[in-house]
Amino acid sequence: MSDPEKLRKAVELTITAGYQLNQEAFGFLTMIAATEDPSEVIGKAIEKLNGLDEKTFFINRNLLEELLKEVEQSNKTTMKAPDTQFQEQTNPQTPMASQITEGKRQFQPYAKGIEKSINIIEDSSGKLSSNGTIEDFLGYFRDRFKRTEKLLRQRIDVKSAASIRDALKAPANMKLKIIGLITEKREKKQLTILSVEDLEDHITVLVPQNASEDLHKKARLLMLDQVVCLSVIKARTGLSIADDIILPEVGQRTPHKASERVSAVLTSDIHTGSTKFQRESFNRFILWLNGKYGNEQMKEVASHVKYVLIAGDIVDGVGIYPNQSKELSTKDIYKQYRLAAKYIEQIPDYIEVVIIPGNHDASRKALPQPAISGAYLEALQESKNVYSLGNPCSVSIHGVEVLMYHGRSLDDVVSTVPGMSNNNPEKAMRLLLQSRHLAPLYGGKTTLSPESRDSLVIERVPDIFHAGHIHALGHCSYRGVSIINSGGWQEQTEYMKKFGFMPTCGKVPVVDLQTLEVAVVPFS
């Protein structure tokens, strides 16, 4: 084995075990490669570091020099070959080392020869200026109503909808349609009573006991502050009886597709800084992107990856949930981001990386969130292939439009809408898409900033709707839109355990942009 090959093997084993070499340590390994096996020294370093109570992510030169002396002494007293000795020493700590194959042929990434095609369609960063006054909130909901009303009136069956004021003046038994924002929802046995308002007036709408099961189902799925169209019959009592509920919806469409066979990796919720961060799995993921992990089929998938889209929660943050500090490997958020940057820097430079914040990141918690400050991502400032955008944002990659959203409001959907579950996040995402709004409910777990323009209204229908937050992998196709929740890289925390939720870890959806087919690549 040549010196460069021995050095590469040592570096791979370091990364797989979840550690990093600093510059001096790498230089030391390069120097000794001609006379010693660097992998043997790294094996001892991993064994020693794994036994320490105080964990560290970096291997320094002083440690390697000390361990080299042990290796030299050991070699004098044993006839075992260095490679064999290394395997015996390190396999218990690094079980995945044997799965990292050099492959039968050199990795030649197809995507490296393809020119990037990425355009930012929508990003709220730099456009946020609310003062949080009552007037701001009134303006915000008026804008939401107007934008969603416009989407509803694009439907043939809603174009002629009347204002609530006109509906109140209508004679009894008249059938008509109104557009309104739901301000109250009360359920009594088989009855649902809705309070609905537009910009001028308000009305009470009843979903009666004898309504069809389909209508009752639609009523159960309604959320507060959602803008919908209601087909009603005016009653003599002043109430209006619901005949149908119409969401803004998305029409059946043919999605855009790339003209070349390139792929996008969709991931999120890395949570560096957490003791539950799946470090080894994420290392395998980075190795895979570099063509250094997996079988030939996995490497073939990796060779076509041109984009990596990360939908928030890059770090675990500080003070996000009760007793979080007990599960932090570092309480310094700057260190958390530096560790995340170390990983992202190892993604090949021909791959374009898009990062948005989540509720654990160093950005304001209210939606929309501006991009993560450069002060935290300082190490990536010079990286020409890394784009730090706001949450949500829309990007076009090779002609395919992707709506990226961290997914905080999925908590509200799951907790308030019957039939929704953390185990099937794609169903909650589909409901948001049907509602044409990323966070309809105000006053729940999701904080909303009253901007003059409600950028959470889904005005452009994407080809791919990508979210995270829930830590559960799920995907489906709905009317030409690929809906994907990308799971995460954090094992079950005490907070998750409290709710009986088991996350999906280390499974990455990869979208072929030429066909929009989704392949899930496992790293756990």
Task: Walk through the language-model features, giving the residues of each.
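Extended recognition/assembly regions associated with phosphoester-bond processing machinery
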Residues: 1-524
